[in-house]
A protein has these predicted regions:
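C-terminal motif of bacterial Sec signal peptides marking the signal peptidase cleavage site
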Residues: 17-20
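N-terminal non-cleavable signal-anchor helices
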Residues: 3, 45-48, 310
Protein backbone atom coordinates (compact mmCIF):
# COMPACT_ATOMS: atom_id res chain seq x y z
CA UNK A 1 0.00 0.00 0.00
CA UNK A 2 2.82 2.40 0.93
CA UNK A 3 4.70 1.50 -2.26
CA UNK A 4 1.58 2.16 -4.35
CA UNK A 5 1.14 5.58 -2.73
CA UNK A 6 4.79 6.42 -3.47
CA UNK A 7 4.38 5.38 -7.10
CA UNK A 8 1.19 7.45 -7.36
CA UNK A 9 2.94 10.48 -5.87
CA UNK A 10 5.87 10.07 -8.26
CA UNK A 11 3.47 9.77 -11.19
CA UNK A 12 1.58 12.92 -10.20
CA UNK A 13 4.87 14.79 -9.72
CA UNK A 14 5.98 13.77 -13.20
CA UNK A 15 2.73 15.14 -14.64
CA UNK A 16 3.25 18.43 -12.82
CA UNK A 17 6.83 18.71 -14.03
CA UNK A 18 5.88 17.87 -17.60
CA UNK A 19 3.02 20.33 -17.45
CA UNK A 20 5.35 23.05 -16.24
CA UNK A 21 7.60 22.61 -19.27
CA UNK A 22 4.86 22.58 -21.87
CA UNK A 23 4.31 26.33 -22.15
CA UNK A 24 8.02 27.08 -22.48
CA UNK A 25 8.37 24.42 -25.20
CA UNK A 26 5.48 26.01 -27.10
CA UNK A 27 7.10 29.44 -26.95
CA UNK A 28 10.48 27.96 -27.92
CA UNK A 29 9.27 25.98 -30.95
CA UNK A 30 9.58 28.90 -33.43
CA UNK A 31 13.10 29.57 -32.16
CA UNK A 32 14.13 25.93 -32.48
CA UNK A 33 12.86 25.96 -36.06
CA UNK A 34 14.65 29.22 -36.87
CA UNK A 35 17.92 28.05 -35.33
CA UNK A 36 17.67 24.88 -37.41
CA UNK A 37 17.07 26.98 -40.53
CA UNK A 38 20.20 29.03 -39.82
CA UNK A 39 22.28 25.93 -39.10
CA UNK A 40 21.16 24.32 -42.37
CA UNK A 41 21.83 27.49 -44.38
CA UNK A 42 25.33 27.77 -42.91
CA UNK A 43 26.05 24.02 -43.07
CA UNK A 44 26.92 23.79 -39.38
CA UNK A 45 25.72 21.70 -36.48
CA UNK A 46 22.83 22.59 -34.23
CA UNK A 47 23.04 25.87 -32.37
CA UNK A 48 23.60 25.22 -28.68
CA UNK A 49 20.72 26.63 -26.68
CA UNK A 50 20.73 27.65 -23.02
CA UNK A 51 17.80 28.14 -20.68
CA UNK A 52 16.92 31.86 -20.41
CA UNK A 53 16.91 33.43 -16.96
CA UNK A 54 13.68 33.84 -15.05
CA UNK A 55 12.31 37.22 -14.04
CA UNK A 56 13.11 38.64 -10.63
CA UNK A 57 10.84 38.14 -7.64
CA UNK A 58 8.11 40.72 -7.18
CA UNK A 59 8.71 42.78 -4.00
CA UNK A 60 7.27 41.35 -0.80
CA UNK A 61 3.97 42.77 0.39
CA UNK A 62 5.42 44.93 3.16
CA UNK A 63 8.06 46.39 0.83
CA UNK A 64 5.60 47.42 -1.88
CA UNK A 65 2.91 49.06 0.27
CA UNK A 66 2.68 52.56 1.74
CA UNK A 67 1.79 52.85 5.41
CA UNK A 68 -1.55 54.56 5.98
CA UNK A 69 -2.36 55.32 9.64
CA UNK A 70 -5.79 54.11 10.70
CA UNK A 71 -8.29 56.88 11.37
CA UNK A 72 -10.06 56.34 14.68
CA UNK A 73 -13.01 58.28 16.06
CA UNK A 74 -15.89 57.58 18.40
CA UNK A 75 -19.35 56.64 17.17
CA UNK A 76 -20.71 59.83 18.74
CA UNK A 77 -18.23 61.98 16.85
CA UNK A 78 -19.11 60.27 13.58
CA UNK A 79 -22.80 60.66 14.36
CA UNK A 80 -22.25 64.37 14.93
CA UNK A 81 -21.36 64.56 11.23
CA UNK A 82 -24.47 62.61 10.16
CA UNK A 83 -25.53 65.42 7.81
CA UNK A 84 -22.51 64.44 5.71
CA UNK A 85 -24.11 61.01 5.14
CA UNK A 86 -21.08 59.07 6.34
CA UNK A 87 -22.54 57.20 9.34
CA UNK A 88 -23.88 54.18 7.44
CA UNK A 89 -20.74 54.08 5.30
CA UNK A 90 -18.44 54.04 8.34
CA UNK A 91 -20.65 51.47 10.09
CA UNK A 92 -20.46 49.13 7.10
CA UNK A 93 -16.67 49.55 7.01
CA UNK A 94 -16.36 48.75 10.72
CA UNK A 95 -18.49 45.61 10.75
CA UNK A 96 -16.93 42.16 10.51
CA UNK A 97 -17.27 41.86 6.72
CA UNK A 98 -15.99 45.37 6.14
CA UNK A 99 -12.79 44.73 8.08
CA UNK A 100 -11.87 41.71 5.91
CA UNK A 101 -12.92 43.26 2.60
CA UNK A 102 -10.41 42.81 -0.25
CA UNK A 103 -8.18 45.77 -1.16
CA UNK A 104 -10.38 46.69 -4.12
CA UNK A 105 -13.44 47.12 -1.89
CA UNK A 106 -11.42 49.11 0.64
CA UNK A 107 -10.40 51.38 -2.23
CA UNK A 108 -14.04 51.93 -3.20
CA UNK A 109 -14.96 52.64 0.42
CA UNK A 110 -12.19 55.19 0.96
CA UNK A 111 -12.99 57.01 -2.27
CA UNK A 112 -16.71 57.11 -1.51
CA UNK A 113 -15.93 58.39 1.98
CA UNK A 114 -13.71 61.11 0.53
CA UNK A 115 -16.41 62.09 -1.98
CA UNK A 116 -19.00 62.53 0.77
CA UNK A 117 -16.65 64.42 3.08
CA UNK A 118 -15.45 66.68 0.27
CA UNK A 119 -19.00 67.36 -0.87
CA UNK A 120 -20.07 68.06 2.69
CA UNK A 121 -17.17 70.43 3.39
CA UNK A 122 -17.91 72.39 0.21
CA UNK A 123 -21.60 72.78 1.05
CA UNK A 124 -23.44 74.93 3.58
CA UNK A 125 -23.42 72.14 6.17
CA UNK A 126 -20.23 73.32 7.97
CA UNK A 127 -22.05 76.58 8.79
CA UNK A 128 -24.67 74.57 10.67
CA UNK A 129 -22.15 72.67 12.79
CA UNK A 130 -20.68 73.64 16.12
CA UNK A 131 -17.12 74.95 16.06
CA UNK A 132 -15.87 71.65 17.45
CA UNK A 133 -17.69 69.55 14.84
CA UNK A 134 -16.71 71.91 12.03
CA UNK A 135 -13.06 71.53 13.05
CA UNK A 136 -13.58 67.78 13.20
CA UNK A 137 -15.04 67.74 9.69
CA UNK A 138 -12.21 69.89 8.35
CA UNK A 139 -9.57 67.65 9.92
CA UNK A 140 -11.23 64.43 8.73
CA UNK A 141 -11.65 65.77 5.19
CA UNK A 142 -8.03 66.92 5.06
CA UNK A 143 -6.81 63.59 6.45
CA UNK A 144 -8.77 61.51 3.95
CA UNK A 145 -7.71 63.78 1.09
CA UNK A 146 -4.05 63.35 2.02
CA UNK A 147 -4.39 59.58 2.44
CA UNK A 148 -6.38 58.77 -0.70
CA UNK A 149 -3.39 58.50 -3.12
CA UNK A 150 -1.65 56.03 -0.79
CA UNK A 151 -4.91 54.12 -0.36
CA UNK A 152 -5.24 53.92 -4.16
CA UNK A 153 -1.66 52.68 -4.48
CA UNK A 154 -2.15 50.04 -1.79
CA UNK A 155 -5.42 48.88 -3.32
CA UNK A 156 -3.58 47.98 -6.51
CA UNK A 157 -0.31 46.69 -5.06
CA UNK A 158 -1.96 44.73 -2.26
CA UNK A 159 -4.38 42.91 -4.55
CA UNK A 160 -3.77 39.25 -5.32
CA UNK A 161 -4.70 39.95 -8.95
CA UNK A 162 -1.87 42.47 -9.33
CA UNK A 163 0.65 40.25 -7.56
CA UNK A 164 -0.36 37.28 -9.73
CA UNK A 165 0.48 39.26 -12.86
CA UNK A 166 4.17 39.19 -11.86
CA UNK A 167 4.34 35.51 -10.89
CA UNK A 168 7.66 33.78 -11.59
CA UNK A 169 5.71 30.51 -11.92
CA UNK A 170 4.78 31.41 -15.49
CA UNK A 171 5.64 30.72 -19.11
CA UNK A 172 6.64 33.02 -21.99
CA UNK A 173 3.85 34.66 -23.97
CA UNK A 174 3.08 32.88 -27.24
CA UNK A 175 1.39 33.86 -30.48
CA UNK A 176 -1.77 32.04 -29.38
CA UNK A 177 -1.96 34.17 -26.22
CA UNK A 178 -2.21 37.49 -28.04
CA UNK A 179 -5.99 37.36 -28.27
CA UNK A 180 -6.17 37.86 -24.48
CA UNK A 181 -4.03 41.01 -24.40
CA UNK A 182 -6.71 43.60 -25.41
CA UNK A 183 -8.99 42.53 -22.55
CA UNK A 184 -6.11 42.85 -20.09
CA UNK A 185 -5.27 46.30 -21.47
CA UNK A 186 -8.89 47.32 -20.83
CA UNK A 187 -8.49 46.19 -17.22
CA UNK A 188 -5.34 48.29 -16.76
CA UNK A 189 -7.07 51.23 -18.44
CA UNK A 190 -9.91 51.08 -15.88
CA UNK A 191 -7.41 51.12 -13.00
CA UNK A 192 -5.77 54.07 -14.76
CA UNK A 193 -9.11 55.89 -14.93
CA UNK A 194 -9.80 55.24 -11.24
CA UNK A 195 -6.40 56.64 -10.35
CA UNK A 196 -6.67 59.72 -12.55
CA UNK A 197 -10.21 60.51 -11.36
CA UNK A 198 -9.74 59.72 -7.68
CA UNK A 199 -10.18 63.43 -6.80
CA UNK A 200 -12.93 64.04 -9.35
CA UNK A 201 -16.17 64.48 -7.35
CA UNK A 202 -18.29 63.78 -10.43
CA UNK A 203 -16.60 60.53 -11.52
CA UNK A 204 -18.39 57.47 -10.18
CA UNK A 205 -16.55 54.18 -9.77
CA UNK A 206 -18.44 50.93 -10.30
CA UNK A 207 -17.81 47.94 -8.04
CA UNK A 208 -18.88 45.25 -10.51
CA UNK A 209 -16.79 46.79 -13.30
CA UNK A 210 -13.73 46.97 -11.06
CA UNK A 211 -14.12 43.37 -9.89
CA UNK A 212 -14.65 42.17 -13.47
CA UNK A 213 -11.41 43.80 -14.61
CA UNK A 214 -9.50 42.41 -11.63
CA UNK A 215 -10.83 38.95 -12.46
CA UNK A 216 -9.44 39.40 -15.97
CA UNK A 217 -6.00 40.24 -14.57
CA UNK A 218 -6.12 37.14 -12.39
CA UNK A 219 -6.73 34.82 -15.34
CA UNK A 220 -3.10 34.87 -16.44
CA UNK A 221 0.20 36.38 -15.20
CA UNK A 222 0.51 38.56 -18.29
CA UNK A 223 3.30 40.84 -17.07
CA UNK A 224 5.46 37.84 -16.23
CA UNK A 225 4.60 36.16 -19.55
CA UNK A 226 5.57 39.28 -21.48
CA UNK A 227 8.88 39.61 -19.64
CA UNK A 228 9.71 35.93 -20.06
CA UNK A 229 8.92 36.15 -23.77
CA UNK A 230 11.41 39.01 -24.05
CA UNK A 231 14.04 37.07 -22.08
CA UNK A 232 13.57 34.01 -24.29
CA UNK A 233 13.74 36.06 -27.49
CA UNK A 234 16.85 37.88 -26.27
CA UNK A 235 18.56 34.59 -25.39
CA UNK A 236 17.75 32.92 -28.72
CA UNK A 237 18.70 35.97 -30.78
CA UNK A 238 22.07 36.26 -29.04
CA UNK A 239 22.73 32.56 -29.65
CA UNK A 240 21.93 33.07 -33.34
CA UNK A 241 24.08 36.21 -33.37
CA UNK A 242 27.08 34.29 -32.05
CA UNK A 243 26.80 31.86 -34.96
CA UNK A 244 26.38 34.59 -37.58
CA UNK A 245 29.32 36.50 -36.12
CA UNK A 246 31.53 33.41 -36.48
CA UNK A 247 30.52 33.00 -40.12
CA UNK A 248 30.42 36.66 -41.18
CA UNK A 249 34.15 36.99 -42.01
CA UNK A 250 33.70 34.73 -45.03
CA UNK A 251 29.98 34.78 -45.80
CA UNK A 252 30.08 32.10 -48.49
CA UNK A 253 26.57 30.93 -47.68
CA UNK A 254 23.24 32.59 -48.29
CA UNK A 255 20.42 32.85 -45.78
CA UNK A 256 16.77 32.15 -46.39
CA UNK A 257 14.28 34.84 -45.44
CA UNK A 258 13.59 35.25 -41.74
CA UNK A 259 9.86 35.25 -41.09
CA UNK A 260 9.82 37.59 -38.11
CA UNK A 261 6.15 38.59 -38.37
CA UNK A 262 5.06 36.61 -35.32
CA UNK A 263 7.96 38.02 -33.28
CA UNK A 264 6.96 41.55 -34.34
CA UNK A 265 3.41 40.94 -33.14
CA UNK A 266 4.66 39.65 -29.80
CA UNK A 267 7.01 42.62 -29.48
CA UNK A 268 4.19 45.06 -30.24
CA UNK A 269 2.01 43.45 -27.56
CA UNK A 270 4.90 43.57 -25.09
CA UNK A 271 5.49 47.25 -25.81
CA UNK A 272 1.79 48.09 -25.36
CA UNK A 273 1.60 46.15 -22.11
CA UNK A 274 4.76 47.58 -20.57
CA UNK A 275 3.70 51.09 -21.55
CA UNK A 276 0.33 50.56 -19.83
CA UNK A 277 1.90 49.08 -16.68
CA UNK A 278 4.51 51.85 -16.40
CA UNK A 279 1.91 54.54 -17.03
CA UNK A 280 -0.32 53.16 -14.28
CA UNK A 281 2.57 53.02 -11.81
CA UNK A 282 3.89 56.48 -12.72
CA UNK A 283 0.44 58.10 -12.59
CA UNK A 284 0.16 57.42 -8.87
CA UNK A 285 0.70 60.75 -7.01
CA UNK A 286 2.80 59.11 -4.30
CA UNK A 287 6.43 58.51 -3.51
CA UNK A 288 6.90 54.98 -4.77
CA UNK A 289 8.40 52.46 -2.32
CA UNK A 290 12.06 51.90 -3.18
CA UNK A 291 11.53 48.17 -3.75
CA UNK A 292 8.92 48.91 -6.41
CA UNK A 293 11.16 51.56 -8.01
CA UNK A 294 14.00 49.05 -8.27
CA UNK A 295 11.74 46.36 -9.74
CA UNK A 296 10.24 48.79 -12.23
CA UNK A 297 13.66 50.00 -13.38
CA UNK A 298 15.16 46.52 -13.63
CA UNK A 299 12.28 44.67 -15.26
CA UNK A 300 9.53 46.96 -16.56
CA UNK A 301 11.43 49.93 -17.93
CA UNK A 302 11.34 50.67 -21.65
CA UNK A 303 14.47 52.84 -21.34
CA UNK A 304 16.89 51.08 -18.97
CA UNK A 305 19.52 49.40 -21.22
CA UNK A 306 19.67 46.41 -18.83
CA UNK A 307 15.90 45.79 -18.74
CA UNK A 308 14.38 42.97 -20.85
CA UNK A 309 12.78 45.30 -23.43
CA UNK A 310 15.98 47.18 -24.28
CA UNK A 311 18.05 43.97 -24.22
CA UNK A 312 15.63 42.37 -26.68
CA UNK A 313 15.68 45.40 -28.97
CA UNK A 314 19.47 45.44 -28.95
CA UNK A 315 19.73 41.72 -29.74
CA UNK A 316 17.17 42.04 -32.55
CA UNK A 317 18.95 45.04 -34.07
CA UNK A 318 22.29 43.20 -33.94
CA UNK A 319 20.69 40.16 -35.55
CA UNK A 320 19.30 42.17 -38.46
CA UNK A 321 22.69 43.83 -38.92
CA UNK A 322 24.53 40.48 -38.92
CA UNK A 323 22.07 38.95 -41.40
CA UNK A 324 22.77 41.87 -43.75
CA UNK A 325 26.32 40.50 -44.25
CA UNK A 326 24.87 37.50 -46.06
CA UNK A 327 23.12 37.23 -49.40
CA UNK A 328 19.50 36.13 -49.40
CA UNK A 329 18.83 32.71 -50.90
Amino acid sequence: MVRWKRRKAAFLLSIILLGGCGGNDLADQPWVAYHQQLANDLSVGNIEQAEPENIGAFPERKARLIEVPETRDSILNVYALRECQITSLVAARNNQLGRVAPPSQQWLYERKLWQRLNSCWNSNIPEQLSDENRDRLEHLTATKTAQLPAVSWNAIFDSSEWEQSFSRASQPLTQADLMDVPQHLEAIDYLQQMTEHQFDPEWQQDSSTLESHLKTLQERPLTAEVLRMLLLANQRLREANNLLRQQSDEPSHCLRQWDAASLERLAEAANQWLMAINRLIDTQPVEKPSAVQRYQTRWLSLHNPQAPWAQFQQAKSQHESLRAHFDTC
